[in-house]
Amino acid sequence: MKDCRQFYIDGKWVAPAAASDFSVTNPATEETIATISLGGIADVNKAVAAAKRAFPSFSETGLEDRVALLRKIIEVYQSRIEEMAETISWEMGAPMSLTRAAQAPVGLAHLNEAVRILSYFKFEEMHGSTMMRKEPVGVCGFITPWNWPMNQIVCKVAPAIATGCTVILKPSELAPLSAYLFAQILDEAGVPAGVFNMVNGDGPTVGAAIASHPDIDMVSFTGSARAGVAVAQAAAPTVKRVTQELGGKSANIILDDADLEKAVKQGVQSCFRNTGQSCDAPTRMLVPKAKMPAAIVAARQAAEATKAGNPLAEATHIGPLAGKAQFAKVERLINKGLEEGATLVAGGLGKPDGVTKGYFVQPTVFADVRNDMTIAREEIFGPVLCMIPYDDEEHAIAIANDTPYGLSGYVTSGDVDHARRVAKRIRAGNVHINGARSAFDGCFGGYKQSGNGREWGEAGLEEFLELKAIFGYEPPKKS
């Protein structure tokens, strides 16, 4: 069992101000694998003070120095990437096949993207007689979730370092071990003292202290809409910048001209990826009403072919849910779907056959779902798919947009131009055409209650900059 009780503050591993142990559980075995400390306000204050001290000098570092630092972080991260993949699998249950292919490498992708952007990005530009200057926003507080730990940590930390900001990170207490390893990577890479600080803790204590702290200039939060509202309320009195990536209930429109069987099976696999614990999962599958019987057959086949089991086994497609509370929530919502009259196509209540230990649920598909049902409105965050029939294309677009969320959308068509036309009408921050994956040089973020601001790529880097106008330069001479 690992002892990870220390916090990383001001370039050193330090003991918490007060002892408060918390057990980290492997959700596949329900066994304790590590102990961390839950921090308090004193720990946050110490970390913020370190970040505030470091900001004046780090914000003035040259572009070449920041690029060199990022390259060193990349080098160290690469040397420990297998350890990162194993750590993520232990702490949140994702299969090793997924942590090796995506969960661990995504951190490298964001670091490399930051270096790429800095190769051309202009921090100063002349607009007539005015110098438009982009400066680091300041001390940043990051509150990150457990479902894609390195994605959500590094897509914040990489642009913060790239722009000259300093950081206080509170990772999820359910999956803190990858963050602990990441702090070790930054330390080994030589990140200056105070530039990156990490304090473990829960949301109501450490998260709230970060959101409300008067010396933090920006808060970036990823998590539930409920928690996002609390973060925004805590941040409001200090009028700091707040960016949020919250929940989703993304629609997957399978158009009438799509290859139905291929589109349905691809949609099921995408919904179940990471055990359905992705905020942009395509959890509402919209199918032409006349084709629904065939779609149900394809969805049942895809669900029954999805193996939930030991994350270390090569044959495993999905692992457990991340914890006991998440297991209870998903089971409650599956039961709600049954109570409200949806037709169970595959899966259902209880653990998969032969599974006695771990927070595993059955890959579940519902048909005959109405868009006003609870399972079509609430973010379930588990491997649960809702199949919803539509009459025509206008009806499909209306259903897709009839949600309080707006993170992602999916459109499948045999005609890519047709898919693109429909994609432009989806009220969401990201739309995937014909199974296209997200690209790191794009951006990620949502409309409506899915949040505000953007992460990834150049748009994500811009979030960490203040725009200053300096008047009084010599106007350009006319030729």
Over which residues does each language-model region extend?
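Residue-level signal for inorganic ion chemistry
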Residues: E30, R66, I88, L111, ...
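ALDH superfamily catalytic-core signature
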Residues: R226-R370, I433, K478-S479
